[in-house]
C-alpha cells in the first residue's frame, strides 16, 4: 500500500532537513538501526521518512528481490498508527540521515581541529612575509 504524499514547500523541506546529512549512495547500507532518515523519491517527492528498522533489507517487489531500507514511524509497536514500510534503494534519489551524538561530537572535534589548523597556517603565513 502506497502512502499518500504530503506536499511540502521547498522552505518546509529545507526546515525538515536541518541537522540531517546527505548520505552518498555507496554508504546507504551502513545506516544503522534506529537512525532517523528522510528521503526524496526518484520522482523528486520529499518524504519525511522514519526510523531505520532494518538496513539493508531484501524486499520482494513484483517477484523481484530488491535491496531496500525498512522503516518505522515509531519504536512503540503497540502504539495506534504504528506502521513499517520498505523503500527500495532504486526508488530513492537522495537519502538524508540524522547524526547521533557520537557523530555530532566527531564533527565538532573535526571543526575545532580545522579551525586551529587554519589559525596555524595564518600565523605561519604572517611570519613568512
UniProtKB/Swiss-Prot annotation:
GO terms for biological process: symbiont-mediated suppression of host innate immune response; symbiont-mediated suppression of host type I interferon-mediated signaling pathway. Belongs to the asfivirus C129R family. GO terms for molecular function: hydrolase activity. This is Uncharacterized protein C129R. It is an enzyme of class 3 (hydrolase). Plays a role in the inhibition of type I interferon signaling pathway. Mechanistically, specifically interacts with 2',3'-cGAMP and cleaves it via its phosphodiesterase activity. In turn, prevents 2',3'-cGAMP interaction with host ER-resident STING1 leading to inhibition of downstream signaling pathway and type I interferon production. The keyword Hydrolase applies. It comes from the Viruses. The keyword Translocase does not apply. Keywords: Host-virus interaction, Hydrolase, Inhibition of host innate immune response by virus, Inhibition of host interferon signaling pathway by virus, Interferon antiviral system evasion, Viral immunoevasion, Virion. Its EC number is 3.1.4.-. It is found in: Virion. One of its GO terms (cellular component) is virion component.
